């Protein structure tokens, strides 16, 4: 009907144009009208044929390129997945297709979680490398259990190579199978070891061999090669509290195993002189403070051959070691008065001695005949005291007497500070006088700590009190010298010292025969029979 209405109108328009314009214009108008009619016919037909059914395109128009529900798709329904999981019609369906979909979703979720965890560990390891450097960051990551994952082919290749001669080849032979299994497990551990033991053993300097002239330890334990136990003795050397933090690292564990065959002085009282260089003090075996030595001896140390461990020191034993010149009964009474507190008891004894010094009454040390006989072999035997003690006698003044019986590595703490000779020089010397000490400083001073003979240095005199500091002309450092923080060097000639490590085995008679050289006048003052003359 549409076409019929459009076709008759065209001739009417053409006749009207023909009557108005004439014959040539009429022919052109008829051709244009026919072309317009022919062009309008295919467009109207194509629009009707290309229309899609509305049901199929409804989800695509509403949710373009969005994920669809797989369960609904299995049952012939297309539904967008966003906000649909809870309200899905087939969420509890147990058909074969839905069960397969559920298993696939579970596997995908596990893979995503694994990738996320690996990415997090890699980020943490990378941060540690940036913070502490490459090698230290890897060591810290390994100590914390964070090891960067290796490529999958490398891990499986090493495991397969280690298992190549494993159960199949080693099972028929009775003991051969166990050895092969142990070898394969050791190869696996060596593959992932950050600190190979061969490098540690090759790069570790050998520890010094024990010298034949070394005496026995105070408790009589022999100095010999250590056992093959991987444990490191806690009380060895000059440990300053960092042993516990170092022992947890993998480097410490490997060094424990590598250091099992190194010689070391074992036993309860064998100090740390023959230990490895890592634990040796830089100033030699004599430079550690008395408190460190006591602490090192009090710490438990395994003996040779699985023997019984050393007993823990009681507070009374600690007091007798700190104050060897006092009677045990007196120290026990002081300890009971302080309620068993060792620190308070030490303070009480020190305060008592300071009060005695202020009153001008220096404490007299009772002579010990055993110490007089063994003073030549002692480590802290000074020349003046050796000669005076060899002559022997209870009438000697306190600074010239031999020290009481004590192990050679443990000296009285405050003997030098409490010497009566220090008081005389204190009263007769100004704080601003030049540093020219009198002859009393060259006598027997038990507070003078000799440095190790291999260093060839003067003895280290620790100023424990203001009196000792004033007597050495160091009054301007009084607030530091009272705390024992300022080491001062003595003015005795270098040839006048006893070489502790080289002349340890000389006897008292040999020490008396070989008189020390005397120095007349000058800086060192006159020496009479090896004893200083009072100025």
Swiss-Prot record:
Main location: nucleus
Organism domain of life: Eukaryota
Name of one Pfam family that matches: DMRT5_DMB
Ranges of residues in domain DMA: 313-348
Annotated PROSITE patterns: DM_1 (PS40000), DM_2 (PS50809)
Annotated segments matching region Disordered: 200-315
One GO-annotated biological process of the protein: regulation of transcription by RNA polymerase II
DNA-binding region: 69-116
Primary role: May be involved in sexual development.
Sequence similarity: Belongs to the DMRT family.
Protein name: Doublesex- and mab-3-related transcription factor A2
């Amino acid at each position: 009907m549409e076409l019929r209405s459009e076709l008759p109108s065209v001739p009417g328009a053409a006749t009207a144009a023909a009557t108005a314009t004439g014959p040539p214009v009429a022919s052109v108008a008829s051709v244009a009208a026919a072309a317009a009619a022919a062009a309008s016919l295919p467009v109207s037909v194509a629009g009707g044929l290309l229309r899609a059914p509305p049901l199929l395109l409804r989800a695509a128009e509403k949710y373009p390129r969005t994920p669809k529900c797989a369960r609904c798709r299995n049952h012939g329904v297309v539904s967008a997945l966003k906000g649909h999981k809870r309200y899905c019609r087939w969420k509890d369906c147990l058909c074969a297709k839905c069960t397969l979909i559920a298993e696939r979703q579970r596997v995908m979720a596990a893979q995503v979680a694994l990738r996320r965890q690996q990415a997090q560990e890699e980020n943490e390891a990378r941060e540690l490398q940036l913070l502490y450097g490459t090698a230290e960051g890897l060591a810290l990551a390994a100590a914390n259990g964070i090891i960067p994952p290796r490529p999958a082919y490398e891990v499986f290749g090493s495991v397969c190579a280690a298992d190549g001669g494993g159960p199949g080849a080693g099972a028929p032979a009775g003991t051969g199978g166990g050895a092969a299994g142990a070898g394969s497990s050791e190869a696996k551990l060596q593959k992932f070891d950050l600190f190979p033991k061969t490098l540690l053993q090759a790069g570790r300097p050998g520890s010094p061999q024990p010298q034949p002239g070394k005496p026995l330890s105070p408790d009589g334990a022999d100095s010999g090669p250590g056992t093959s136990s991987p444990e490191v003795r806690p009380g060895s050397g000059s440990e300053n509290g960092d042993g516990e933090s170092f022992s947890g690292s993998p480097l410490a564990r490997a060094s424990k195993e590598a250091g099992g065959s190194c010689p070391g002085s074992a036993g309860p009282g064998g100090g740390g002189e023959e230990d490895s260089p890592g634990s040796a003090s830089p100033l030699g075996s004599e430079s550690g403070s008395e408190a460190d030595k006591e602490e090192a001896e009090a710490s438990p140390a395994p003996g040779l051959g699985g023997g019984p461990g050393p007993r823990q020191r009681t507070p009374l034993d600690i007091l007798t070691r700190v104050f060897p010149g006092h009677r045990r009964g007196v120290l026990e009474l002081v300890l009971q008065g302080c309620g068993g507190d060792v620190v308070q008891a030490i303070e009480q004894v020190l305060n008592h001695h300071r009060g005695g010094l202020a009153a001008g009454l220096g404490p007299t040390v009772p002579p010990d005949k055993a110490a007089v006989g063994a003073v030549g072999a002692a480590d802290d035997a000074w020349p003046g005291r050796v000669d005076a003690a060899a002559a022997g006698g209870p009438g000697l003044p306190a600074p010239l007497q031999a020290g009481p019986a004590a192990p050679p590595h443990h000296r009285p703490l405050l003997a030098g500070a409490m010497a009566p000779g220090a008081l005389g020089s204190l009263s007769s010397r100004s704080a601003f006088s030049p540093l020219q000490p009198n002859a009393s400083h060259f006598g027997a001073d038990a507070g003078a700590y000799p440095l190790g003979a291999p260093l060839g240095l003067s003895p280290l005199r620790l100023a424990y009190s203001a009196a000792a500091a004033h007597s050495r002309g160091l009054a301007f450092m009084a607030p530091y010298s009272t705390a024992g923080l300022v080491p001062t060097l003595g003015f005795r000639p270098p040839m006048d010292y006893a070489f502790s490590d080289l002349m340890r085995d000389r006897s008292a008679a040999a020490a008396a025969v070989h008189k020390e050289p005397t120095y007349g006048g000058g800086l060192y003052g006159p020496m009479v029979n090896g004893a200083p003359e009072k100025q």
